[in-house]
């Protein structure tokens, strides 16, 4: 009992406790507590999802901007070092190469030592997790720290290594979302909800894209196209709300840091608005889409083939298994040596950063026409107001530098994707596509120097518009997405080329999707992740194939009248996570599901009231409190492969039991379903 020491001031008789009297500022504490309880009540009346999404967007914007700020300082220090070492070729070469070699080897070594799951972009693993597969290690907090440090070091190498930020940052956003979800569940006392978690992870994927490009609309659509096979419209508002908060905060930080006067697009363009293109140019935009589609197929095929070669080659596989930092340093040395500006790098604009590459390629002036009569000298240092001069070397024409840039970056990017470190691969593909479009645009500007005559109006061709279409088409073809067109508009703030850019993206996807799997699907296949392949039911005849053709008939059931000795034998001889519970051994009528963990626990804690020597059955264990689950969904042997595939994808299922007239006859898991789809798509050769 508390010791009472007096009455409250102004009270009619309610006593004051000793703890309350001597506590520090009891009235203030009570007021603060009441205020916090009132605020909590009002906030949760609105809905906790809103606060969760706002916190996620703001937090990811802060992380993205902080990373960009730190990376910018490191890149600036590298340029200063390269500029100040003098004219000696050896010192300049060492200052150019040692920097990325050290950063890349540290990125690979640090990230792999902290978490071996931090390498790559992380998007294939996220796509697998959003389909219902549990990959806990990829959402671990250690993985977050390794990914942040490793990605920062990778991006600090600049355009020398030529890698991006999108994929790993989406992975970081999903990890933050999972962590905040656990905190929220503990705060409000909510049990874990798998469906709710997947909804929040989908919104987090949109936030990751939006806080990299400050593009909320394309961020949501790109995350849907890349991550989801089926998407609920109910999740739309979550994705757009969180992405808008993140993009707004990201651009607002740039204004606060005096980087810009107001919130604008990242890559500003000066395209002609009144007549941006003539009607006959639509044909060339569509042709550009077909070219990007063909080149994307070549890139995807070469990338998968080279990755397979690196993994199977005796020397490279041994080096990757024993010393990943050494492999990263070796690849970085090769790439840095090629991009050394006084060497081959002078012919591929190697002194420009990746952002400056896009700024220059989106220039609306024709470089070929500007250098037709005279070749400007190659500047000693890049001019921020005339970045296009980096593409004009006295020994090469504009077409030569653009073509050389494409050829070199094509295989250099494939080589860089084999390094085991956190890195994104979307931005390099986007820039390569812009160079493809720029090359075609410059060729058309030379072929039609006065523009294509359409009626009485004559308008010069803008190669920057073709660069914009090429960037969207090539990146869309590699990733099998259409939203890259909208991303190009949000990045540049221009929508005057909306129709030709969209037509180019559609043409590129028409070729790529029919010839090659996307970059992320190819990575899923290379890593052998548990992901169901996509099927076209009506085209490959998945309806005639039924469950009875591929189900697992070796089903271990537990009947209620099974003696406990046999139950123990079944549990110890099998390793399945759950058993189908049937009524009797004769009828095999499916009545429920019993988890292995619950069954083992019940067997180990037999009631003391049981008489020794008396035979007991499974139904006695169940009556004693062993929990069972009802069978809410099951397959029929006549269910088609297409229907089973749709159920597994939309409901994120792992396995289902097959019943015929209530009798358990088999089961279907991911393994059987994936094998059936593979056999249907690639039938075995006749014997």
Curated annotation (Swiss-Prot):
Residues 507-687 are cytoplasmic. Anion-selective channel permeable to small monovalent anions with ion selectivity for chloride > bromide > nitrate > iodide. Forms a homodimeric channel where each subunit has its own ion conduction pathway. Conducts double-barreled currents controlled by two types of gates, two fast gates that control each subunit independently and a slow common gate that opens and shuts off both subunits simultaneously. Assembles with the regulatory subunit BSND/Barttin for sorting at the basolateral plasma membrane domain. GO terms for biological process: body fluid secretion; chloride transport; kidney development; regulation of body fluid levels; renal absorption; renal inner medulla development; response to calcium ion; response to pH. InterPro entries: CBS_dom (IPR000644), CBS_dom_sf (IPR046342), Cl-channel_core (IPR014743), Cl_channel-K (IPR002250), Cl_channel_volt-gated (IPR050970), ClC (IPR001807). It catalyses: chloride(in) = chloride(out); bromide(in) = bromide(out); nitrate(in) = nitrate(out); iodide(out) = iodide(in). Belongs to the chloride channel (TC 2.A.49) family. CLCNKA subfamily. Keywords: Calcium, CBS domain, Cell membrane, Chloride, Chloride channel, Ion channel, Ion transport, Membrane, Metal-binding, Repeat, Transmembrane, Transmembrane helix, Transport. Induction: Regulated in parallel with BSND under furosemide treatment. Decreased to half in the inner medulla under furosemide treatment. In the renal cortex and outer medulla levels were weak and did not change. Regulation with BSND in inner medulla is limited to the thin limb; levels in collecting ducts were not affected by furosemide treatment. During furosemide treatment selective down-regulation with BSND in thin limb plays a role in maintaining salt and water homeostasis. Ca(2+) binds at residues 259, 261, 278, 281. It holds the Pfam family Voltage_CLC. Homodimer. Interacts with BSND. This is Chloride channel protein ClC-Ka. The chain crosses the membrane at residues 52-72, 94-114, 161-181, 204-224, 236-256, 282-302, 325-345, 396-416, 417-437, 458-478, 486-506. PROSITE patterns: CBS. GO terms for cellular component: apical plasma membrane; basolateral plasma membrane; chloride channel complex; plasma membrane. Expressed predominantly in the kidney. Expressed strongly in the cortical thick ascending limb and the distal convoluted tubule, with minor expression in the S3 segment of the proximal tubule and the cortical collecting tubule. The gene is Clcnka. Its main location: membrane.
